[in-house]
């Protein structure tokens, strides 16, 4: 580690800001399908108006969504509980719905109207959520049918290479620089999950 104990304490007590720079987006077999889709814009299939990227917390969904936001000048919403059809009708730019959670009770008829408006207006929508949206406990059959037409892309659990890159990035976000041996040591001993990576970084 290249910081002493005192400076480390000061940094950890300071509110750090996550960055969503393209250069810090690490393509890997775990996430390359999602990243390839974002990189291929605007050469998306005509019928690919709504895309959902899903995976566990910390898997980089927000990073990918924010890269696309900058690329297409999209409007991003954290959840949709406060939205109305008026919002959708009035916005002519691509949309992002962030962090749809599987155990939340969503207004299904309103969602169905949202999705129909996106398609009929030839707009684009990117959704991020914690699980495959087809596994949500939807009741409205028309909504289920509509969701089944989405491009649904999973971000898988990290492999060893991605774990090390995420560790380096998260420490860097906190203005900490650790040597390669220490990163290697951590990566070989933690659970293969994004949550475990976040927990280790928070502890250190």
Name each region found by the language model.
Residues 177-189:
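Short conserved motifs of the RecA-like P-loop NTPase core
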Residues 150-162:
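Conserved AAA+ ATPase "SRH/arginine-finger" region at the nucleotide-binding site
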Residues 190-202:
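The conserved phosphate-sensing helix
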Residues 88-108, 114, 121-130:
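Conserved P-loop NTPase "ATPase switch" module shared by AAA+ and STAND
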Residues 47-64:
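Walker A/P-loop nucleotide-binding motif
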Residues 133-148:
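Short regulatory helix/loop adjacent to the ATP-binding pocket of P-loop NTPases
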Residues 161-177:
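Conserved AAA+ ATPase "sensor/coupling" helix adjacent to the nucleotide-binding pocket
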Residues 1-40, 44-46:
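A short, basic N-terminal segment
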